[in-house]
Amino acid sequence: MAKDTTGRLHVQVKTGGKRKLSSKLWLERQLNDPYVAKAKAAGYRSRAAFKLLEIDDKFRLLKHGMAVVDLGAAPGGWSQIAAKRVGSVDGKGKVVAIDLLEMPEIAGVEFAQLDFMDNDAPAKLTAMLGGGADVVMSDMAANTTGHRKTDQLRIVGLIETAAAFACDVLKPGGTFLAKTFQSGADADLLAQLKRDFATVRHVKPAASRQDSSERYVLATGFRGGAKA
């Protein structure tokens, strides 16, 4: 172990055998990330839970009794926070988590293993909720290729699809929150969100790694409304 510039102990992982440098760096980052340790101690499935906690503490998106949709939910960190904040753990609000991957059960969360891009996904979702959603949120990230321009377009395309889904299921006044990355490729996305929502802003919670271009687009005051 070594100490970093703050005086904290820093775990170093040796490269050996078949371990690649990229794997070594990822493992070191995980071992030295305070949010990873905090998530484990709090029983959260991922460090991403703290990102939603920080955003919600500031903007008060999740209120008791709300209906929430978590797109690309696995492993479930955001769904855990939403269930507590809207009261679905106590049967008051409702949280539906959607993912292509299987996800272990979470108290107060209804899970649907499906592709939200399917044409019938909005109808299935509103049937599960018994109506429209108050919040649609997504911490998804597109698979990357290593080619910067291609990756930027993939990321923006995924968010655009998530936003279109949100517009199909949100109630009037609803909220859309999604992960994005700082680039010049999202001008059309932001323009569309500004047409559909009263307020659109970017936020970067402290739990987002500071050396990452990751940030979140937060759109509030949906101007439309889910079809009955």
UniProtKB/Swiss-Prot annotation:
Primary location: cytoplasm
Sites where the protein binds S-adenosyl-L-methionine: G76, W78, D99, D115, D139
Gene Ontology MF terms in the entry: rRNA (uridine-2'-O-)-methyltransferase activity
InterPro entries: RNA_methyltr_RlmE, RNA_MeTrfase_FtsJ_dom, rRNA-MeTfrase_E, SAM-dependent_MTases_sf
Enzyme class: transferase
Location(s), subcellular: Cytoplasm
Protein's UniProt keywords contain Cytoplasm: yes
Taxonomy, superkingdom: Bacteria
Region forming the signal peptide: none
Purpose: Specifically methylates the uridine in position 2552 of 23S rRNA at the 2'-O position of the ribose in the fully assembled 50S ribosomal subunit.
Classification via PANTHER family: RIBOSOMAL RNA METHYLTRANSFERASE, RRNA METHYLTRANSFERASE 2, MITOCHONDRIAL
Protein name stated in the entry: Ribosomal RNA large subunit methyltransferase E
